[in-house]
C-alpha cells in the first residue's frame, strides 16, 4: 500500500519539513533554514535564491549582490539535475492545494466532462514576459507582490491573512474551472522551471514492452501531455513540463515507468508537447 504512495508521502514530508524549518527559524531563532522561498540561507551561510525572482529584480534595476547571484546559481544547478518543475511538486506549498483539487476532480468525474483543456499552457510564458516588463517600469519585482505562492508561504510562517483567500481561489479554480489550472497554465514560476527542466538529468522513462495500456499514469498525471509516448515507444519524458512528482511511477503496476538518468548521448528525439 505504502509503495503506491511512496513518492507522494516523500513529497509531503519534504514540503511540510521545509515549512517547519522556516517557522522555527522565524519563531524560535533556530536558523537551519531561514528566509522564504524567494531568498533563503542554510545555516546562516549558504545562500539560495529564486532565479525567476532575481530576473525580475534585474529588470527592475535592483543591485544584485554576489550572494544573491550565487544563491540563484545553486538553485539552477540543483533543478537542472533533479528536474526544474520538481520545485512545483516537491517544494511549493501550493502543490498540496492543487493536488487535492485534482484528486477531487477525478473522484467527481470532472475530468471526463472537461476532456479538452480550454486554455493554452503558453499563458504562463506570457505572464513571465509581462512580469519582466512591469518590473522594468515599476522598479520592483512585479510578480512577487501578487504571487499566491508567496501569500501562502508567508501565511504559513507569519499567520494567514490573504493566504487563506489565495488558497481558496486556487483550489476552486483548479477544482471547477480547469484541471491543473494554476500550476499548469498560469503560474509563471512553473513556466520558468519548465524551461529549466528541459536540461534536467533525472527523468521518468517509459518501457513500452512492459506497458499494458491501463492508462492509470495519464489519469493521475497533472501534466498528462508529457506522457505522449505511453503505449507507443520506449523513451524518457523529454518535456520540461514534467514535475517529476512520481505519481505515474507509483500507480504503474507493470513497471513500465521508472526514474532514470538522462542519456546525454541521445537527445535528438523530437519532443511532442
Predicted regions and their residues:
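Non-ligating segments of multi-cofactor redox enzymes
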Residues: 1-235, 240-243, 250-273
